[in-house]
């Protein structure tokens, strides 16, 4: 457990976004975001998409940072 939670915690801290603000933007209770950030529960793939959309609405750099931290850096396909 935890890759999404770790990435989300780092992004929220780095960009000054509160758990409550993200939860409100997603239409979810703050407790859901708390559980992801504290690695008590992993968000589903569909929820990760919702996290990215909500972050983009607040700060596009935060959304890109979350994607990068969660998925890692893209690698070039070497032939």
Stretch-by-stretch model annotation:
Residues 45-65:
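DNA major-groove recognition helix of helix-turn-helix/homeodomain DNA-binding modules
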Residues 27-43:
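Recognition helix of helix-turn-helix/homeodomain-like DNA-binding domains
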């Amino acid at each position: 457990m935890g890759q999404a939670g770790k990435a989300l915690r780092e992004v929220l801290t780095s960009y000054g976004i509160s758990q409550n603000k993200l939860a409100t933007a997603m239409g979810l209770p703050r407790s859901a975001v708390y559980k992801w950030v504290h690695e008590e529960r992993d968000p589903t793939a569909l929820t990760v998409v919702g996290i990215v959309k909500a972050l983009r609405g607040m700060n596009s750099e935060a959304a890109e940072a979350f994607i990068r931290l969660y998925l890692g850096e893209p690698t070039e396909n070497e032939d």
